[in-house]
Amino acid sequence: MERTCLAVILAAGDSTRMKSSKSKVLHPVAGRPMIAHVVEAVASAGISSVALVVGRDAEEVAKAASIDGVGIESYLQKDRLGTGHAVLAARDAIAKGYDDILVTYGDVPLQTDAPLKAARQGLADGSDIVVIGFHSDRPTGYGRLLVKDGELIAIREEKDATDAERTVTWCNSGLMAINGRKALDLLSRIGNSNAKGEFYLTDLVEIARSLGGRVTAVDAPEIEMTGCNNRAELAVIERFWQERRRREMMLAGVTMIAPETVFLSYDTIIGQDALIEPNVVFGPGAVIDSGAVIHAFSHIEGAHVSEGATVGPFGRLRPGADLANGAKVGNFCEVKNGRIGEGAKVNHLTYIGDAVVGAGSNIGAGTITCNYDGVNKSETVIGENAFIGSNSSLVAPVTIGDGAYVGSGSVITADVPADALALGRARQEIKPERAKLLRERALAIKAAKRAKA
């Protein structure tokens, strides 16, 4: 029978060091609140449910933690009396009787499921407590994990450690797995006879051992256990997340010419043999199919780029943009809620918003779909194999038929039938010698101003 598991995520801190008007767990990593990364990690570890311990910004934190397929209940920690007290805020959830209890933190967004699964396996193998640790070249400030004969005998805080114990490099991450059938009994035994009068979760090690229980530890990469307390640490976490995800993509067949300049979102999907040039930013909701090319300095969010399509350089795709196979959106072009048909070209200095561009059509430089009247958005439909001349304005709602031509500089306010030529501009006039007269008049005005000065 599969073991049941409750994940208790502690996210009730005051976040004072973040210097922010909102809880630190709401700050994004790769375009997603860090608390959501934590929920995803515990979900991948096979948990049955999540108990989210909240304090500041409780409603916002609970909303940010919500991801599909994961049952979450929130529990308010009114007073901040230590980690042991925080876990007991979820007493009602723990009392439901799970095999395993995983305790983790909402400000550790780089954690993965591997050490969480290892901790759960430790419980399955007979441990009552499994602490997740990490080895560090700079252990100063961390509690040390002291192990003897394969069991964890103590977590020694820096200030209490002997000189010999300070040489230990295996450190306490704070993450822990607890035998769910014994959890409430163990947690209720934590006291607060310390200088701060707080209830420390780490006391469970000695409590469990004093009752004859087995306590062990498992290892995790140090970077995955990194907590986020300020903006500098947030930047470090963002950098590592990006490095890890870029490497995964490149090993899966994506070419990145200068990967350190490419920034991905938590849900970015890029297919095999796609080419990503330098200085490209992907916001949430970007899907890039196999063989697509994203040229330098492009920004893509909420958009789909099909096989063989190209974007940029300096292209921007906003939510709802959808490029069909072989479509091109070139330099200094923006597409928002627009479908660009197969082989269609939008090559220069163009805005396509709330529009459909048919297959094989060519949109000239400087073309604007005028989709907003100050109140409502309207749609522009351009048929297949149409040609829109440069510097044209298409005032929506309007339809340009298949094979139609729009002359350069036109302002189109009415539908254009298929294969028709539309001209929406004033007729050119030539006035001989008029430029000379205008120039002479301007020079005379200038001279008069100088004479008065």
Curated annotation (Swiss-Prot):
A single GO BP: UDP-N-acetylglucosamine biosynthetic process
The catalysed reaction is: alpha-D-glucosamine 1-phosphate + acetyl-CoA = N-acetyl-alpha-D-glucosamine 1-phosphate + CoA + H(+); N-acetyl-alpha-D-glucosamine 1-phosphate + UTP + H(+) = UDP-N-acetyl-alpha-D-glucosamine + diphosphate
Indicate whether Magnesium appears among the record's keywords. Answer: yes
Ranges for region Linker: 232-252
Enzyme Commission number(s) of this protein: 2.7.7.23, 2.3.1.157
Q: Please name the Gene3D superfamilies in this protein's record.
A: Hexapeptide repeat proteins, Spore Coat Polysaccharide Biosynthesis Protein SpsA, Chain A
Query: Per the record, what is one GO cellular component?
Result: cytoplasm
Q: What class does this enzyme belong to in the EC scheme? A: transferase
Q: Record's InterPro entries? A: Bifunctional_GlmU (IPR005882), GlmU-like (IPR050065), GlmU_C_LbH (IPR038009), Hexapep (IPR001451), Hexapep_transf_CS (IPR018357), MobA-like_NTP_Trfase (IPR025877), Nucleotide-diphossugar_trans (IPR029044), Trimer_LpxA-like_sf (IPR011004)
Which residues participate directly in catalysis?
348
Tell me one GO molecular function of this protein: glucosamine-1-phosphate N-acetyltransferase activity
The ranges of region (Pyrophosphorylase) come to 1-231
Q: Which residues bind acetyl-CoA?
A: 365, 371-372, 390, 408, 425
Q: Give the region (N-acetyltransferase) as residue ranges.
A: 253-453
Cite the record's note on assembly. Homotrimer.
In the record, the note on similarity to other proteins reads: In the N-terminal section; belongs to the N-acetylglucosamine-1-phosphate uridyltransferase family.
> What functional role does this protein have?
Catalyzes the last two sequential reactions in the de novo biosynthetic pathway for UDP-N-acetylglucosamine (UDP-GlcNAc). The C-terminal domain catalyzes the transfer of acetyl group from acetyl coenzyme A to glucosamine-1-phosphate (GlcN-1-P) to produce N-acetylglucosamine-1-phosphate (GlcNAc-1-P), which is converted into UDP-GlcNAc by the transfer of uridine 5-monophosphate (from uridine 5-triphosphate), a reaction catalyzed by the N-terminal domain.
Q: Under which name does UniProt file this protein? A: Bifunctional protein GlmU
Recite the lineage of the species: Bacteria, Pseudomonadati, Pseudomonadota, Alphaproteobacteria, Hyphomicrobiales
